[in-house]
């Protein structure tokens, strides 16, 4: 299942990178982008535990600041190649058919699929959570057949009220084998568990019969476990240091 999760995540990273025009390659060892990817996104994702630095490093641009590698099985040592460990996390898996936990919120979240560039702009602004605009999620993503982006709104929020900002959101990537859950956020941290429940519900509706996968760390790993996910193995993200080989 960890291989399926890694492959699904590589597909999502590839979709984001394609929307920026990044040329990429994929084989049984890794997905790689020949040009620096958008912020927060890796330049390579390994797809098998025996992938080696040789499988990756000649296919990515280590000369540009921010170059990173997602080591999906936490088996690489990229220290000799000028990388440092940025963080570790756990792949997670939730079986298909497991009911979503009931929400304990006094007000229910309404979920909407993002379908327009304007809606994607609002989603991205809410996801980033800062005044400085970001350019990561571009409208071309809305044409990716495997990608579905969702906003969650508190019931009663509408354009008529003058405040239709998302209360939360998430991304589902359905590749036919598993559904990847990523980029989950809540504008109010007290609603984060409700957004998890909403994401599980939408995954079952849009990609029925498929297990959910993703990766988390810290408090969000604990929330994932509370919502029926189980850890299935570690991953590691490596960041290249400027001036290194």
List the model feature ranges, each with a label.
Residues 1-21, 34-36, 95-101, 173-175, ...:
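Terminal substrate-recognition subdomain of acyl/acetyltransferases
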Residues 1-63, 72, 129-146:
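N-terminal charged segments
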Residues 47-117, 212-222, 229-241:
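Acyl-donor-binding surface of acyltransferase catalytic domains
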Residues 53-55, 186-206:
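Conserved acetyl-CoA-binding loop-helix of GNAT-fold acetyltransferases
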């Amino acid at each position: 299942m960890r291989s399926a999760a890694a492959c699904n995540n590589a597909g999502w990273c590839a979709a984001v990178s394609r929307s920026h025009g990044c040329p990429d390659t994929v084989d049984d060892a890794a997905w790689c982008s020949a040009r620096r990817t958008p912020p927060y996104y890796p330049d390579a994702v390994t797809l098998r535990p025996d992938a080696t630095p040789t499988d990756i490093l000649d296919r990515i641009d280590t000369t540009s600041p921010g170059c990173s590698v997602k080591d999906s099985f936490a088996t690489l040592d990229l220290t000799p190649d000028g990388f440092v460990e940025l963080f570790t996390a756990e792949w997670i898996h939730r079986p298909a058919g497991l009911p979503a936990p009931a929400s304990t919120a006094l007000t229910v979240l309404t979920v909407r699929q993002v379908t327009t560039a304007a809606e994607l702009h609002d989603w991205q602004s809410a996801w980033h959570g800062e005044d400085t605009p970001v350019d990561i999620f571009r409208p071309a993503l809305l044409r990716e057949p495997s990608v579905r982006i969702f906003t969650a709104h508190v019931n009663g929020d509408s354009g008529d009220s003058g405040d239709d900002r998302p209360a939360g959101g998430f991304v589902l990537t359905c590749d036919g084998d598993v559904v990847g859950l990523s980029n989950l956020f809540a504008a109010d941290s007290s609603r984060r568990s409700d957004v998890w429940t909403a994401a599980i519900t939408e995954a079952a509706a849009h990609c029925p019969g498929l297990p959910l996968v993703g990766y988390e760390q810290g408090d969000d790993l604990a929330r994932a476990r509370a919502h029926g996910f189980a850890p299935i193995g570690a991953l590691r993200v490596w960041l290249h240091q400027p001036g290194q080989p």
